[in-house]
Amino acid sequence: MTTPLTWHDVLADEKQQPYFLNTLKTVAEERQSGITIYPPQKDVFNAFRFTELGDVKVVILGQDPYHGPGQAHGLAFSVRPGVAIPPSLLNMYKELEATIPGFTRPTHGYLESWARQGVLLLNTVLTVRAGQAHSHASLGWETFTDKVIALINEHCEGVVFLLWGSHAQKKGAIIDRQRHCVLKAPHPSPLSAHRGFFGCNHFVQTNQWLVDRGETPIDWMPVLPAESE
């Protein structure tokens, strides 16, 4: 069941909180001082732009944005067209290939088509300094994304939360399992994928859950915008 509420409706007050204004101010000051911050300012809130609150069917929690040039564009795990597919996403594609009939591994890592179908690709920290993983982890983003998760938990029904790795699982501890579907596995990173991400069957289980609820399943084959027109 969807909610008529929008992100603006439920986050307007949060965005006026002193901690949040301070987060934005710190990021803006770092950019102005010449520090390269990813993703570009216009892309920081893309996860919310591409997936409205009332359209959320699935939440995939990431952690930090990618910190290499041209990679991050505001959607967790996704990279811009033309950028090499990162190892964790490649492992996600391998799991899809092994479990979703007809899935063929794409040559790009751009996941906007997932987001447009209701997959909220949410990093728990929304900015990072170039080349410095977790450099913005203590700026206040975690407080904001905790609030986002709590709002989805409260206002939406029957959302599938894919929690990969201990960080995502801690963030998702508040989710009401009576109202939502929570699936846990190790992170798809090469460091942990062989400990149970491969074979977790989460993409299949997600679609089965949606179909059982009378909803349209996700087409997990990522399509570039030009291909879908």
Curated annotation (Swiss-Prot):
Record's catalysed reaction(s): Hydrolyzes single-stranded DNA or mismatched double-stranded DNA and polynucleotides, releasing free uracil
Compartments, record wording: Cytoplasm
EC number: 3.2.2.27
GO molecular function list: uracil DNA N-glycosylase activity
Active site residues according to the UniProt entry: 64
Pfam families: UDG
Family (UniProt): Belongs to the uracil-DNA glycosylase (UDG) superfamily. UNG family.
Name recorded for this polypeptide: Uracil-DNA glycosylase
GO cellular component, one term: cytoplasm
Uppermost EC category: hydrolase
Keywords, sorted A to Z: Cytoplasm, DNA damage, DNA repair, Hydrolase
HAMAP family, per database record: UDG (MF_00148)
Predominant location: cytoplasm
Functional note: Excises uracil residues from the DNA which can arise as a result of misincorporation of dUMP residues by DNA polymerase or due to deamination of cytosine.
GO biological process: base-excision repair, AP site formation via deaminated base removal
